[in-house]
């Protein structure tokens, strides 16, 4: 749609019964959208001058006068046009400042000459030289002026909100009128077609009548011919008088024939007259019908023209509504900028006051005045920064401001400045508190504190607990306050934990498990633990004696021989006991995670701790299946389509991360640490990998699997699982003990090529066999209705595919992932996921405990500086590399930092790689022990690193509203996702359900508070207008499969449906309707399915009341389902006449459901096609 010009200023709209004033940016007003209201007031007309079109195409500057008025009660039709005023070339240009308190007369009476230049920057303002010099001399606004700016921006936001709501309502009304006109046009054309059908029938009857007339004429001619023949025959008989008797008989016969011919002639004449009369009537009727057709044609054409004009009006008002919402978003940004500027000024002022108080006891009065000058300069700097961030609205040079600026210019601050600053600080506190209270009133149940949501997040994978929708948060507490509060609540457990920790340190220092310690390399690590423990304090020495006392107590018990079976059982009991004790304990610690509990339990009962577990090797072999079941579960929650949409990050970001990180670490290891080339290659590739099990578990616990950084992290981890195969193949080839004599390019190429072929054959076979066999096999087993056999078949599929990939040289986890990916496409995925949940949880916990068993705390104490330095370099270096690589792939800085923190720790495959390197003679056992320790500690730090990433995001990402705007690069990997328009209570529940099933979605809302809450929970929620084509394009609407629309107002819902159906018709839209009439209009606008919001809440309340009335649960469910089915059937029947499908957008094979039996629900008696949107 072309616009004549974008006027870069604000205009005043004045209308309504109460003459309320509305501020609107003049870029919303174009020569094509020109206002002409009632009573001579001009409003928009869809026609536009061709000269103005060419002007906008050539991007020429057009000047307009500044006065426009809008009647708030216009009836939805636009007429007339706004002619551009004669351009006035004036050397000056400035921004016209429009406040909600201004009037139209003020704007009209403004006799200044304005010139507005159209350009890329909407906020570019030019001043004359005098004004520019004056502005440079003026100092920044004071705190009071900043508060005034904030108040003005808040008022402007309120006006913009009312304005956008008004335009959305008008857009809805105009659209409804357009729909009615369209229906009238369609009805008129139907009447025309029906009349034409009647005319055609009349024409057919006319042709039949003409044929009858022709037949009657022919019959009359035949009768006359017979009469003539009879007369001639009679005359001929009269001349022949041979026999009188014969003549008499012949004459008699001839007379009879003559009479018969006369009768036929008479009958034919009557028939002919009747046919001619009928033909005349049909011709008259045809003429009348033709006139009726002409009249209906004219009426239909008029209705069609009116409908087309109405559609143009709808397009125009939709553009105006979109621009009104855009202005509201800009006003929100200005309010946010004003708040930030005010907070900066207050922070600077409070800091300066504290500094003055501290220095006041030493400095004299002169120094105090100098300190005040420094404070003033800081405030001026902050004010200049705020001025650059703000679009200054209504800054007028009043007397107070001028006096303040003159004081600053002369460098003579008053002696009472400190007192005034203190008063201003107190006022600013009250303003901020009042502002926070207003925001909390706007969102009473939705904007609960971030701290509360984060605490509940640790308890469950559901990121929206029930308290989120009912609690009123008192504000976001700091991290320190949350730690103190948690410590007060959990102080007995903390004391117990520190006691156990001290006992463990004492045990390690006392040399428990000395026989299991690996030999140390003198030139790399320090083998003496005495240097560490010689300086211990008396309390620690007393704690070191605890293990000996515990051993003495144990020796007092009678000793019995333990056979192999009992030893295995005891190992299982110790593992379960340790997990039961440590996991709940670490979950209570702030920032704790079950992973940390498992790791701590493994350290304590492992070979480097109390040495309780005897068969460590067998335990590790079993624990590997924990990772197998985890990857199988991840595959169940994904799909082939979603995986294909992530190929950019899997093969792009993943390969870049592995190659770059391995190269950097390998070079540092070779040139800085002096390791050999093969060892540097193994160390670089081993440390480049991350822990799939730990990271995915942490993401699921925190509910971040579907977030931006969660998707990117999973993609990199998936590629790392493939890269492990290459590393394990490479280690024997570069070994000095290899039969081929070390590194050989040909040998490596041959091995990798053979491995690639085997992997491709194995993966292809698994995918092909799974698609052909899994569904029939599971159907056959499900028909037996045996849960044990069903679970056994699931275990067979998991272990079988894992074995196949292991035999092909791939990891077992990759095979399980493929099996889960194939089962996700069947209808048995939910049952399969439920069956494997117990195995997955226990085996995954066992895996984390085996990782803890690999950590040697005594070796850590002996080589603490070396290990901590290596650990710090690993975490910081990998994070920096991932941030750089992620930025190149379009990931934002904050998301890239969070991905880097999650991928920075080492992985479980490093244990395998380093162990194999020791066996091949590439690295020494001492070095591998140190690397085991570094990798194990880094894995233990993963939950805290994830929490640190969230803290960074909450501190930096949510400061500015602009950071909440959608960016196309952040959603370009989404395919077939869901768009949630409106992140209120309904949108949040939908987001929770989708996130729990790992279904990708993107949410939009115009409330920055709601968006900030969603972003703090790592959800893909963006600040934007759901009815804007540009915003919808940025969130990938052209690739989305459906949209759930639950905005606050009916007008906003209607505008969003209209935009999606017009610009993105492939997206199925499911909308919340306020009532049936609203739902019908939404369906006419293009909604796929409409859900009346009154039905389901009524049914829920009715169910609660019936339960209170002591009705059985089964009877309540039957009654509710019966009513729902009957209501939807009646609603569908009522909508059949209008051609809509209101009633959740699905059809039934039966018009009315059968009454359900006691043993059956109503859902068993009807076949439903489609998805029930409730």
Curated annotation (Swiss-Prot):
The chain crosses the membrane at residues 566-586, 593-613, 621-641, 649-669, 679-699, 714-734, 747-767, 808-828, 842-862, 866-886, 899-919, 929-949. Disulfide bonds: none annotated. Residues 142-350 form a coiled coil. The keyword RNA-binding does not apply. Residues 975-1092 form the RCK N-terminal domain. Repressed by sodium ions Na(+). Keywords: Abscisic acid signaling pathway, Acetylation, Antiport, Chloroplast, Coiled coil, Ion transport, Membrane, Plastid, Plastid inner membrane, Potassium, Potassium transport, Transit peptide, Transmembrane, Transmembrane helix, Transport. Residues 1-57 form a transit peptide. It is found in: Plastid, Chloroplast inner membrane; Plastid inner membrane. The full-length protein being inactive in a heterologous system, the N-terminal region (58-556) seems to have a regulatory or auto-inhibitory function. Disruption phenotype: No visible phenotype. Disrupted K(+)/H(+) efflux antiporter in the kea1 kea2 double mutant. Double mutants kea1 kea2 display strong growth retardation along with pale green leaves associated with a delayed formation of chloroplast pigments and electron transport complexes, as well as maturation defects of the plastid ribosomal RNAs and hampered RNA-protein interactions. The double mutant kea1 kea2 exhibits a drastic photosystem II (PSII) quantum yield recovery under moderate salt stress. Impaired rapid hyperosmotic-induced Ca(2+) responses in kea1 kea2. Belongs to the monovalent cation:proton antiporter 2 (CPA2) transporter (TC 2.A.37) family. KEA (TC 2.A.37.1) subfamily. Acetylated at Lys-170 by the stromal acetyltransferase enzyme NSI. It comes from the Eukaryota. Pfam families: Na_H_Exchanger, TrkA_N. Electroneutral K(+)/H(+) efflux antiporter modulating monovalent cation and pH homeostasis in plastids, especially during plastid division and thylakoid membrane formation. Transports K(+) and Cs(+) preferentially relative to Na(+) or Li(+). May function in osmotic adjustment. Collaboratively with KEA1, adjusts alkaline stromal pH upon light to dark transitions in plastids. Together with KEA1, critical for chloroplast development, including chloroplast RNA-metabolism (e.g. This is K(+) efflux antiporter 2, chloroplastic. GO terms for molecular function: potassium ion transmembrane transporter activity; potassium:proton antiporter activity; proton transmembrane transporter activity. It comes from Arabidopsis thaliana (Mouse-ear cress). Optimum pH is 5.8. Induction: Up-regulated by osmotic stress and down-regulated by high K(+). GO terms for cellular component: chloroplast inner membrane. Detected in leaves, stems and flowers. Expressed in shoots and roots. Mainly localized to leaf veins, hypocotyls, mesophylls and guard cells. Accumulates at high levels in small and dividing plastids (at protein level).
């Amino acid at each position: 749609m072309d616009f004549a010009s974008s006027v870069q200023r604000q205009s005043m709209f004045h209308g309504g019964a109460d003459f309320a004033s509305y501020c609107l940016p003049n870029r919303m007003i174009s020569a094509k959208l020109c206002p002409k209201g009632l009573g001579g007031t001009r409003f928009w007309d869809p026609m536009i001058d061709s000269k103005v079109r060419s002007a906008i195409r050539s991007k020429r500057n057009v000047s307009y006068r500044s006065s426009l008025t809008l009647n708030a009660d216009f009836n939805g039709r636009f007429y007339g046009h706004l002619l551009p005023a004669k351009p006035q070339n004036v050397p000056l240009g400035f921004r016209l400042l429009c406040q909600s308190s201004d009037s139209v007369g003020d704007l009209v009476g403004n006799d200044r000459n304005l010139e507005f230049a159209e350009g890329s920057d909407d906020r570019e303002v030019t001043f004359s030289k005098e004004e520019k010099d004056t502005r440079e001399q003026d100092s920044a606004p004071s705190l009071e002026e900043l508060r005034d700016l904030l108040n003005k921006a808040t008022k402007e936001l309120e006006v913009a909100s009312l304005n956008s709501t008004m335009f959305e309502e008008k857009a809805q009304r105009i659209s409804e009128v357009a729909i009615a006109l369209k229906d009238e046009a369609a009805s008129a054309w139907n009447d025309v077609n029906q009349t034409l059908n009647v005319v055609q029938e009349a024409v057919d009857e006319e042709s039949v009548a003409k044929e009858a007339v022709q037949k009657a004429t022919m019959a009359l001619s035949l009768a006359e011919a017979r009469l003539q023949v009879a007369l001639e025959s009679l005359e001929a008989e009269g001349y022949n008088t041979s026999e009188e008797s014969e003549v008499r008989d012949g004459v008699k016969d001839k007379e009879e024939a003559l009479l018969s011919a006369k009768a036929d002639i008479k009958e034919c004449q009557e028939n002919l007259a009747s046919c001619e009369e009928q033909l005349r009537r049909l011709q008259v009727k045809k003429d009348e019908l033709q006139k009726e057709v002409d009249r209906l044609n004219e009426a239909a054409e008029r209705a069609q023209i009116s409908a087309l004009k109405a559609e143009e009006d709808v397009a125009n008002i939709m553009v105006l509504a979109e621009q009104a919402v855009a202005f509201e978003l800009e006003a929100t940004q200005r309010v946010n900028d004003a708040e930030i500027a005010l907070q900066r000024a207050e922070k600077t002022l409070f800091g300066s006051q504290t500094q003055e108080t501290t220095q006041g006891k030493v400095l004299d009065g002169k120094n105090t005045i100098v300190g005040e000058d420094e404070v003033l300069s800081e405030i001026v700097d902050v004010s200049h920064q705020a001025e650059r961030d703000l679009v200054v609205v209504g800054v007028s040079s009043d007397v107070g401001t001028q006096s303040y600026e003159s004081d600053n210019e002369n460098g003579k601050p008053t002696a009472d400045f400190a007192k005034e600053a203190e008063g201003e600080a107190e006022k600013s506190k009250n303003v901020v508190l009042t502002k926070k209270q207003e925001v909390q009133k706007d969102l009473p149940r939705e904007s609960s504190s971030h701290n509360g949501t984060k605490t509940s997040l640790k308890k469950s994978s559901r990121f929206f607990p029930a308290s989120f929708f009912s609690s009123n948060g008192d504000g976001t507490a700091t991290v320190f306050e949350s730690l103190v509060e948690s410590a007060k609540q959990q102080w007995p457990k903390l004391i117990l934990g520190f006691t156990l920790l001290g006992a463990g340190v004492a045990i390690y220092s006392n040399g428990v498990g000395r026989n299991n310690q690996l030999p140390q390399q003198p030139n790399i690590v320090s083998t003496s633990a005495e240097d560490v423990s010689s300086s211990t304090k008396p309390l620690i020495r007393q704690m070191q004696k605890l293990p000996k006392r515990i051993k003495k107590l144990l020796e007092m018990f009678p000793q019995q021989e333990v056979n192999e079976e009992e030893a295995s059982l005891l190992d299982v009991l110790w593992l379960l006991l340790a997990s039961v004790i440590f996991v709940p304990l670490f979950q209570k610690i702030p920032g704790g995670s079950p992973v940390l509990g498992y790791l701590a339990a493994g350290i304590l009962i492992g070979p480097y701790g109390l040495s309780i577990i005897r068969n460590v090797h067998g335990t590790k072999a079993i624990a590997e299946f924990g990772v197998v079941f985890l990857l199988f579960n991840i595959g169940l929650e994904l799909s082939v389509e979603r995986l294909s949409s992530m190929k950019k990050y899997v093969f792009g970001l993943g390969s870049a991360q592995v190659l770059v990180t391995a190269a950097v670490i390998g070079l540092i290891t070779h040139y800085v640490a002096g390791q050999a080339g093969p060892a540097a290659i193994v160390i670089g590739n081993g440390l480049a990998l991350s822990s799939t099990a730990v990271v995915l578990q942490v993401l699921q616990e925190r509910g971040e699997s579907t977030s931006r950084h969660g998707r990117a992290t999973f993609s990199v981890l998936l590629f790392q699982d493939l890269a492990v195969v290459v590393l394990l193949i490479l280690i024997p080839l570069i070994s000095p003990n290899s039969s081929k004599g070390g590194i050989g390019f040909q040998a490596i190429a041959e091995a990798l090529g053979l491995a690639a072929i085997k992997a491709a054959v194995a993966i292809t076979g698994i995918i092909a066999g799974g698609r052909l066999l899994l569904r029939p096999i599971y159907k056959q087993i499900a028909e037996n209705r045996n849960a044990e056999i069903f679970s056994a078949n699931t275990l067979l599929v998991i272990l079988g595919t894992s074995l196949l990939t292991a035999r092909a040289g791939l990891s077992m986890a990759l095979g399980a992932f493929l099996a889960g990916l194939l089962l996700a496409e069947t209808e048995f995925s939910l049952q399969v996921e439920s069956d494997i949940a117990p195995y997955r949880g226990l085996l995954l916990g066992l895996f984390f405990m085996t990782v803890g068993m690999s950590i040697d705390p005594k070796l850590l104490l002996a080589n603490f500086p070396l290990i901590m330095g290596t650990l710090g370099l690993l975490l910081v270096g990998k994070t920096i590399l991932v941030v750089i690589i992620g930025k190149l792939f379009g990931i934002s800085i904050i998301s890239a930092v969070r991905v880097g923190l999650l991928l920075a720790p080492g992985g479980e495959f490093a244990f395998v790689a380093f162990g194999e390197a020791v066996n091949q003679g590439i690295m020494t056992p001492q070095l591998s022990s140190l690397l085991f320790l570094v990798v194990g500690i880094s894995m233990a730090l993963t939950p805290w690193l994830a929490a640190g990433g969230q803290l960074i995001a909450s501190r930096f990402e949510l400061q500015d509203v602009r950071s909440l705007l959608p960016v196309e690069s952040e959603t370009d990997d989404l395919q077939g996702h869901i768009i949630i328009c409106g992140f209120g209570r309904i949108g949040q529940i939908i987001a929770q359900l989708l996130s729990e099933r790992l279904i990708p979605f993107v949410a939009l809302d115009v409330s920055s508070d709601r968006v900030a809450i969603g972003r703090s929970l790592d959800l893909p929620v963006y600040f934007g207008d759901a009815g804007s084509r540009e915003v919808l394009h940025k969130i990938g609407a052209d690739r989305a499969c459906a949209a759930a629309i639950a905005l606050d107002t009916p007008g906003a819902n209607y505008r969003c449906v209209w935009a999606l159906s017009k610009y993105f018709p492939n997206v199925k839209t499911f909308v919340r309707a306020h009532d049936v009439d609203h739902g019908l209009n939404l369906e006419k606008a293009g909604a796929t399915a409409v859900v009346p919001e009154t039905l389901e809440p009524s049914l829920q309340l009715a169910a609660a009341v019936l339960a209170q009335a002591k009705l059985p649960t089964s009877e309540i469910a039957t009654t509710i389902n019966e009513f729902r089915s009957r209501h939807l059937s009646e609603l569908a029947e009522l909508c059949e006449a209008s051609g809509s499908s209101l009633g959740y957008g699905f059809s039934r094979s039966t018009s009315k459901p059968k009454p359900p039996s006691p043993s059956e629900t109503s859902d068993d008696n009807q076949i439903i096609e489609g998805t029930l949107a409730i």
